[in-house]
Amino acid sequence: MGFSDLTSDAGLKQLNDFLLDKSFIEGYEPSQADAVVFKAVGVAPDTAKYPNGARWYKQIATYDLATLPGTAKEVSAYGPEGAAAAEEDEIDLFGSDEEEDPEAERIKAERVAEYNKKKAAKPKAVHKSLVTLDVKPWDDETPMDELEKAVRSIQMDGLVWGLSKLVPVGFGVNKFQINLVVEDDKVSLEALQEELEGFEDYVQSTDIAAMSKL
């Protein structure tokens, strides 16, 4: 299906609904998909009518669109798709009572066992969050390249570092802002912040600027 006219109310509502549980058009980081849709929207959506679209538009506006990764496609290639047909193999768990015989019962039992085996083999859902983290240095003399190396040196099971940038905060000081994806059951954000603040030569404090479930 994809996005339609993103300058119309219907198109903006479609975008707003699509972004209800997403931070970006595709994946966990900004890409050319966001750049294409951003250009198609043209102007910032009304915050009152389209809060999700407005949030996304404001965030993408902070990036240099030409540098975002990926390959640009037509705007209709992005967005909601038709509901996929269920891929579950359907089996008849309820046979007719009219033709009960040992062979039919054996086949039915095999089908039930196979069905239960498939259900048990399905992997459990992994809950993830997309987090934008602000890392604040001590002053304008803090070496930000070394600060970034220190941040990215932290490795945890269930933690994936993403894109980062420097954001001016005044008086020549920049804060380091970075996106990350965490598996909720494996990574404690509080523990991560404590570890980051352990780099006392570079880091004054950390804050969670934004967070959304994936």
Swiss-Prot record:
<comment type="similarity">
    <text>Belongs to the EF-1-beta/EF-1-delta family.</text>
</comment>
<comment type="subunit">
    <text>EF-1 is composed of 4 subunits: alpha, beta, delta, and gamma.</text>
</comment>
<dbReference type="InterPro" id="IPR014038">
    <property type="entry name" value="EF1B_bsu/dsu_GNE"/>
</dbReference>
<dbReference type="InterPro" id="IPR049720">
    <property type="entry name" value="EF1B_bsu/dsu"/>
</dbReference>
<dbReference type="InterPro" id="IPR001326">
    <property type="entry name" value="Transl_elong_EF1B_B/D_CS"/>
</dbReference>
<dbReference type="GO" id="GO:0003746">
    <property type="term" value="F:translation elongation factor activity"/>
</dbReference>
<dbReference type="GO" id="GO:0006414">
    <property type="term" value="P:translational elongation"/>
</dbReference>
<dbReference type="InterPro" id="IPR036219">
    <property type="entry name" value="eEF-1beta-like_sf"/>
</dbReference>
<dbReference type="GO" id="GO:0005085">
    <property type="term" value="F:guanyl-nucleotide exchange factor activity"/>
</dbReference>
<keyword id="KW-0251">Elongation factor</keyword>
<dbReference type="Pfam" id="PF10587">
    <property type="entry name" value="EF-1_beta_acid"/>
</dbReference>
<protein>
    <recommendedName>
        <fullName>Elongation factor 1-beta</fullName>
    </recommendedName>
</protein>
<dbReference type="GO" id="GO:0002182">
    <property type="term" value="P:cytoplasmic translational elongation"/>
</dbReference>
<dbReference type="Pfam" id="PF00736">
    <property type="entry name" value="EF1_GNE"/>
</dbReference>
<dbReference type="InterPro" id="IPR014717">
    <property type="entry name" value="Transl_elong_EF1B/ribsomal_bS6"/>
</dbReference>
<dbReference type="GO" id="GO:0005829">
    <property type="term" value="C:cytosol"/>
</dbReference>
<comment type="function">
    <text>EF-1-beta and EF-1-delta stimulate the exchange of GDP bound to EF-1-alpha to GTP.</text>
</comment>
<dbReference type="InterPro" id="IPR018940">
    <property type="entry name" value="EF-1_beta_acid_region_euk"/>
</dbReference>
<keyword id="KW-0648">Protein biosynthesis</keyword>
<dbReference type="GO" id="GO:0005853">
    <property type="term" value="C:eukaryotic translation elongation factor 1 complex"/>
</dbReference>
<dbReference type="InterPro" id="IPR036282">
    <property type="entry name" value="Glutathione-S-Trfase_C_sf"/>
</dbReference>
